[in-house]
Amino acid sequence: MDKVDTRYDIGTETILHEGNELIDISAIAAAHAPWWNRTLCAVNDTWVRLGVMEGDFHWHKHDDQDEFFFVLEGRLDIELEDRTVVLEPGKAFVVPRGVMHFPHARGRTVALMVEQAGVVPTGD
């Protein structure tokens, strides 16, 4: 179950597309406000999510799940406790489970995220 946080428009429990459907990521991403996050589809035991982000998220971690980020447009800085990872279009990064991280989108950023089904995007 997603945590309720009014700063972010996050609704990952509903899967928007089933298998054997065309997914128009550009059209979906164009229609939403900053820090919008939805599950596009399920692939086996994982969710593929689309995030439209701008500005700061918050420090958080996922105790039992790794988190994969792939930037499609914009720039996403992921601050870790010991460094900052800069993701621009075509770049990807895996935040290992249990690692504190602070995503910051420098301007409007669109990214795909892949995580275990049932993830709470706001952290544990």
What do these predicted ranges mean?
Residues 81-97:
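Short acidic-glycine-tyrosine-enriched beta hairpin
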Residues 44, 72-73, 88-89, 107:
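A cytosolic small-molecule/anion-sensing beta-strand core signal
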Residues 33-34, 47-63:
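Conserved short histidine dyad/triad with adjacent acidic residue
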Residues 97-124:
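Ligand-binding loop in jelly-roll beta-barrel domains
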Residues 44, 79-83, 106:
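Short strand-coil-strand connectors
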Residues 1-49:
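A short, N-terminal "cap"/entry segment at the start of jelly-roll beta-barrel domains
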Residues 52-54, 62-79, 114:
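Short, conserved beta-strand element in jelly-roll/cupin
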